[in-house]
């Protein structure tokens, strides 16, 4: 009986109720900005989110993320002459000189708090040998995170015509960075002691440029801000990325090309987000999907290959405070993005009207050891056609069909190619918002092999 009810719930679309209006009572003065739900990646509000600008030192968020994924904190970094002197004059520095050594940990604090450009170069050389080779890793990581409008040519963010980002891409990078515990700890730090080096034989204390975590800057300080990174060059103007959290609701914000309003714009975005939206745990409301892991197993296989169909109980969606979970609808997407969990067979997308508000993955796990396994052969046989009907759906856009991103000189803030500011834009087009019809062949096979545990 339970099986029948679950399959009916999956196969029969939910009744579409009149959804609550999406709030839009916010504006910013900077040329581009965004507030993104850090749990789901849903865009809450954006202005020119795919226009490209020079990022300045918020580039170091991506540099730090790559370092944290590839290095241990106690590794020793040696500062080369190129690392120390291949920077613009009077740019941010922690005072390291040629031949100095420091731990990866100290370099990261210098990078993210002091915004030390020589630390960015030294870390890049430590990993890749040269800053140019490290830039290759930066672009690969950005693409892995879903970035399509950006290109990186150095680890520090100094001016280069081939170094540019969009607000949306930078939000994806910042969201990923705040998912790293070490990154979150560093950018929340208000004071750190760097060990002695040649120019500072007694060591030095450093503090972040981000005023939103400093109580001695009352006009900018916010207790809900959990960290961030500032940037400035004469071309980029002021840039700022911030993470903030109240309860289970967590946002990241990005401001680009700001003429001094980066903090007031960020505060406006955060006030808008926390006053108008709430994070909702899927498992608290959607009993159809949240109980899959407890109630269903895929059988008809040898005992050693039995699988459990599960969904992450901690997955959240973001909703306006006036909206109810019952107003959301569900679609399944079988074109999984990079970084999908092992054993994932589909992404369950939650939408409010036409807007994606969150997602969770359906995954297959070993029923005994809870280790991820490959899909059962019966499902593999139907995957190529039944589970990936993208070629038959003219509404699905493909990254390979997209024109190359314009550089900073082609800032198309008002161009026709830009989506309306209130729409989630490309995120919905490429990844989550396409409502694919559930392939009947897939469910026929699943209905045969799924039994109540």
Stretches found by the model and what they are:
Residues 16-168, 172-181, 185-186:
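Active-site-adjacent loops and short helices of periplasmic peptidoglycan-processing enzymes
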Residues 7-8, 12, 40, 84, ...:
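Generic "edge-of-domain/loop-turn" microfeature
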Residues 1-19, 443-453:
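Sec-dependent N-terminal signal peptides of Gram-positive bacterial secreted proteins and lipoproteins
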Residues 7, 14-18, 31, 122, ...:
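N-terminal cationic amphipathic segment used for targeting or macromolecule association
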Residues 147-148, 162-164, 169, 174-444:
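Domain-terminus/edge residues, biased toward the C-terminal soluble/receptor-binding domains
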């Amino acid at each position: 009986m339970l099986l029948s009810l679950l399959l009916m719930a999956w196969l029969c679309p939910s009744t579409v109720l009149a959804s609550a209006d999406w709030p839009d009572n916010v504006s910013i003065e900077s040329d581009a900005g965004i507030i993104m739900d850090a749990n789901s990646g849903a865009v809450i509000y954006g202005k020119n989110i795919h226009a490209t600008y020079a990022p300045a030192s918020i580039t170091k968020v991506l540099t730090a993320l790559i370092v944290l994924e590839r290095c241990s904190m106690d590794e020793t970094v040696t500062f080369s002459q190129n690392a120390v002197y291949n920077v613009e004059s009077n740019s941010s520095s922690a005072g390291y000189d040629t031949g100095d050594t420091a731990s990866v940990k100290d370099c990261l604090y210098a990078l993210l708090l002091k915004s030390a450009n020589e630390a960015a170069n030294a870390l890049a050389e430590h990993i890749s040998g040269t800053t140019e080779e490290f830039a290759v890793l930066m672009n690969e990581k950005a693409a892995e995170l879903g970035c399509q409008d950006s290109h990186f040519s150095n680890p520090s963010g100094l001016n280069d015509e081939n170094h540019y980002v969009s607000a949306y891409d930078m939000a994806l990078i910042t969201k990923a960075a705040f998912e790293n515990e070490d990154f979150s700890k560093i950018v929340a730090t208000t004071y750190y002691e760097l060990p002695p080096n040649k120019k500072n034989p007694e060591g030095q204390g450093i503090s972040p440029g981000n005023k939103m975590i400093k109580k001695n800057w009352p006009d900018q300080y916010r207790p809900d801000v959990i960290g961030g990174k500032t940037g400035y060059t004469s071309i980029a103007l002021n840039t700022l990325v911030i993470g903030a959290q109240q309860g289970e609701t967590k946002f990241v914000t990005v401001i680009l090309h700001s003429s001094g309003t980066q903090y007031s714009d960020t505060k406006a975005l955060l006030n808008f987000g926390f006053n108008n939206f709430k994070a909702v745990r899927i498992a608290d409301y959607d009993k159809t999907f949240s109980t899959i892991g407890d109630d269903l197993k895929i059988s008809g296989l040898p005992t050693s290959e039995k699988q459990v169909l599960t969904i992450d109980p901690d997955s959240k969606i973001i909703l306006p405070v006036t909206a109810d979970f019952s107003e959301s609808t569900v679609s399944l997407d079988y074109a999984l993005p990079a970084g999908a969990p092992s054993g994932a067979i589909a992404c369950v997308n939650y939408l409010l009207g036409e807007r994606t508000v969150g997602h969770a993955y359906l995954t297959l796990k070993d029923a005994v050891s809870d280790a991820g396994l490959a899909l059962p052969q019966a499902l593999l046989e139907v995957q190529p056609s039944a589970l990936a009907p993208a070629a038959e759906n003219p509404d699905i856009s493909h990254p390979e069909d997209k024109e190359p991103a314009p550089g900073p000189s082609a800032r198309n803030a008002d161009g026709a190619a830009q989506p309306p500011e209130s729409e989630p834009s490309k995120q919905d087009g490429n990844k989550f918002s396409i409502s694919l019809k559930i392939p009947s062949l897939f469910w026929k096979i699943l209905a045969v092999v799924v039994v109540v545990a």
